[in-house]
A protein has these predicted regions:
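Short loop segments at secondary-structure junctions
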Residues: 34, 225-228, 350-353
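Glycine-centered tight turns that cap/initiate beta-strands
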Residues: 76, 148, 315-318, 366, ...
Length: 429
């Protein structure tokens, strides 16, 4: 069933899987590693990428593909690939078009794990990264580019600094330098922001967060808009535009057109590196996606109330939440986010600094101290001690993380109960 004219709420329920007569209404779990064919030639056609189908779940599985298609539809992309984690998604998204000797430019205010991936791990593979201030001018961002730059990377809403990305600015710089803009859209989700509509080329997600919503599965997604012209810059992206010796000389852009990028990531990287999620995890993810619009709306409503409460409290020195009119990124949120809604995550600092933050967190009763974020239950974390612990002081400043910053992931409980829990904990801070 074609879903292009339906609203996102409807796509969350119906896109990706349309049952035929007598088939299950719920997405089936294809719990199988392998798939049967009648002849050796049929199987051979699959291995040569000359036919569509399934032969081994490490590359593709019907359950996984249905969910990937749903997320691609939500983002307005042409194709998608699910991975075993958000980190795997970001790694694949970059490594699919980068190799030893290449260079990446990335916003500095990104999740600590991604910062380490780009700044440390990829360096071991011969891929260098230059970090730029997300608020830098287009000229300052452009100055970080080198002749061997292949990618510009950023997050729509930075974790945990909550910087709102000026997507059009970043897209313009990327395209002027003939590279794609890859945007991690985890916090915003396609319910609140669709980066392709503002010039981004590839979107990634940690589906572990709002898309799942219940902290029961770990996963990631890569979605391609199909808009970046790889052939126009074939001298840079020869992995897509020149013959792949591992598939008897197939040229991805020639054979797969707008789906070349995702096809290469699936048939080459997933084949060699794995990182495929289990069909059961994808089934759970699909259940989360079905209620995503309802949950995102409630998360944002609750977060707005909590942010206003914190902003007015005498023990809170400052609150970072773009839903507040006095927030630095309020105008960008109004521009890029549906109805100005961003996410359910708030960052704030207490007047007593780091010690007060510890006392506050240890006094919470309803909210859980947990590494996770963007789940249905309220959770709290101290980034400098947890997610960004591997950074030095200078790197923390560049990432927008102060020593006393608290990251609060507001759940979908009663807003009154959440605020009362915070109020009691603040008395002990």
């Amino acid at each position: 069933m074609m879903m292009s004219h339906y609203d996102l709420e409807t796509k969350c329920l119906h896109s990706g899987y349309t049952p035929k007569k007598g088939e299950p209404c719920a997405l089936p779990i294809y719990q199988s590693t392998t798939f049967k064919y009648d002849t050796t030639d049929e199987m051979g056609q699959l291995f040569d990428l000359k036919a569509e189908g399934y032969f081994y779940t490490r590359l593709q599985n019907p359950t996984n593909d249905a969910v990937a298609a749903k997320i691609a539809d939500l983002e307005g992309g042409v194709a998608g690939l699910l991975t075993s984690s958000g980190q795997a998604a970001n790694f694949y998204a970059i490594f699919n078009i980068c190799e030893a000797g290449d260079h990446v430019v990335a916003a500095s205010t990104i999740y600590g794990g991604t910062f380490n991936l780009l700044g440390v791990t990829l360096k071991k593979l011969g891929i260098d990264c230059t970090f730029v201030d997300t608020d830098a001018s287009a000229e300052e961002i452009a100055a970080a580019f080198k002749p061997n730059t292949k990618v510009l990377f950023a997050e729509t809403i930075a974790n945990p600094a909550l910087v709102i990305l000026d997507i059009e600015k970043f897209a313009k710089v990327a395209h002027e330098h003939e590279v794609p803009l890859i945007v991690d859209n985890t916090f915003a989700t396609p319910i609140n922001c669709r980066p392709f509509e503002w010039g981004a080329d590839i979107v990634t997600h940690s589906t572990t967060k709002y898309m799942d919503g219940h902290a029961v599965q770990v996963g990631g997604a890569i979605i391609d808009s199909g808009n970046f012209d790889w052939d126009a810059y074939g001298h840079k992206y020869h992995g897509l535009t020149e013959p792949d010796e591992s598939y008897h000389g197939v040229v991805y852009t020639k054979q797969f057109g707008k789906k070349a990028y995702i096809t290469k990531a699936t048939t080459q990287l997933m084949r060699d590196l794995g990182s495929i999620p289990s069909p059961e995890n994808c089934f759970l993810l699909n259940l989360g996606l079905e209620t995503l619009p309802l949950r995102v709306e409630r998360h944002c409503e609750n977060a707005q109330k909590v942010a206003e409460f914190l902003d007015a409290h005498e023990k809170v020195s400052h609150v970072i939440y773009a839903g507040l009119p006095n927030d630095k990124y309020h105008e960008l949120a109004q521009k890029y986010m549906d109805k100005g809604r961003t996410c359910g995550v708030i960052s704030f600092e207490l007047t007593g600094g780091r010690d007060a933050a510890v006392r506050f967190m240890d006094s919470l009763k309803l909210a859980n101290i947990a590494t996770h974020v963007a789940a249905s239950k309220t959770m709290v974390l101290h980034p400098a001690s947890h997610t960004h612990r591997q950074m030095n002081d200078e790197q923390l400043r560049e990432a927008g993380v102060s020593p006393g910053m608290i990251r609060l992931s507001v759940g979908i409980e009663s807003a009154k109960d959440i605020i009362n829990d915070l109020k009691e904990a603040l008395e002990n801070a």
